[in-house]
């Protein structure tokens, strides 16, 4: 690709728009992958009265917030808009946007929208109860988070919107459209709709036909890193970017995060530790799990897919524990000028591996086909205050997060026959040195910690640079820009101890699921349609 910019002539930068579940960020990077500035705003999704589980995406307000973030990032960076060489967008997966035939966005929902539980149940009954299996084999997705039941819900309950709908995209594509006026989706994000074929990396309209839904709403598919268009004059006035700035196709947050971590080759493995924890393994060719426990998504690297297992609310559980039980530690940490989690890890380091047998019951390993969890609890507590205290419970939570990750990675190995030799640990969880070491000890693998731990925006910026002709290859650039802070090596004796802890936890968790099944306790989370 011919260069649109010549970086040697002046100082150019790249902008990434990162639309997460709870916030929107505009992040500016230099061409060496260094973060220069950020603009950020929280956003909230709208629960519709009398529509249980609904979480609509506020298109008008959220576009205003995105524009404010872009202006804020430019201001904080102290650079003129003409030095932004290109912009791209990434977003939470599963969130969808519908447009009418004039190109006006008319409806959107966030990834957490769970209104279509009844529709999921109805769809599962199609084709003699084989429809979900057919969707999974083709797309790597089940119906729980798919766009298909949401579209069916609109057909049932908001036929006015359903009839008007002319095009569907993801939220990252909506941001790019608002900037450029060009509509397209990329495989990595659109793959989470349950409508995109893993092998062809293109839509599979037959799935909509099978569900009795319209198949004429599917937008063009373009690979991540493709030049989509340029910032329009109208958008430039609102967001502060220069009209004519290249707008590049972005992608899904996890896949672009892996690009930013240099996880771009077959068999490379990452654990992304945020609100949810994703365990991701790169597969050289599309293959799905016969047990339907693991989702499979297109990578942003063409031809490659990612097996992904998800631990539910891992980071959120830690935050709950800190806020509910550690007010004293928060005050002490503030006086010491350190993070509360750092103080808790220092306290926890004196607790022996295995946490005196305490077993947290929060997220289960991923069971994509029948995805639900036990009621949150701690099992096997002691009334000895020297053995059972805040430090013990905190370590038990860190160990349990690592155990669930190891279970999820084992599920991927079982069907893919890929056994990684190491893994990358990123996201907020990787800031904890003890937690990183525990993950190494539990998994039995060396754990590499990057300097840039929140790598999604960096991966998005790399895509922008490829689309502008600044970088020649996403994979090579991702590998070149990633820098490593430290490596944690597993201790064999601790790994053996944790294997025993893992076996006991799995047996206890299965019993706890039985309490939910009998209506005696309330699940941490249950997928729509169960």
UniProtKB/Swiss-Prot annotation:
Entry-linked Gene3D superfamilies: 3.30.420.40
Places the protein is found: Cytoplasm
Enzyme Commission identifier(s): 2.7.1.189
GO molecular function: autoinducer-2 kinase activity
GO cellular component, one term: cytoplasm
Swiss-Prot/TrEMBL GO biological process terms: carbohydrate metabolic process; quorum sensing
Main location: cytoplasm
Pfam families: FGGY_C, FGGY_N
Catalytic activity as recorded in UniProt: (S)-4,5-dihydroxypentane-2,3-dione + ATP = (2S)-2-hydroxy-3,4-dioxopentyl phosphate + ADP + H(+)
Keywords noted in UniProt: Cytoplasm, Kinase, Transferase
HAMAP family: LsrK
Recorded family membership: Belongs to the FGGY kinase family.
Task performed by this protein: Catalyzes the phosphorylation of autoinducer-2 (AI-2) to phospho-AI-2, which subsequently inactivates the transcriptional regulator LsrR and leads to the transcription of the lsr operon. Phosphorylates the ring-open form of (S)-4,5-dihydroxypentane-2,3-dione (DPD), which is the precursor to all AI-2 signaling molecules, at the C5 position.
The name this protein goes by in its record: Autoinducer-2 kinase
Species for this entry: Escherichia coli O9:H4 (strain HS)
Gene behind the chain: lsrK
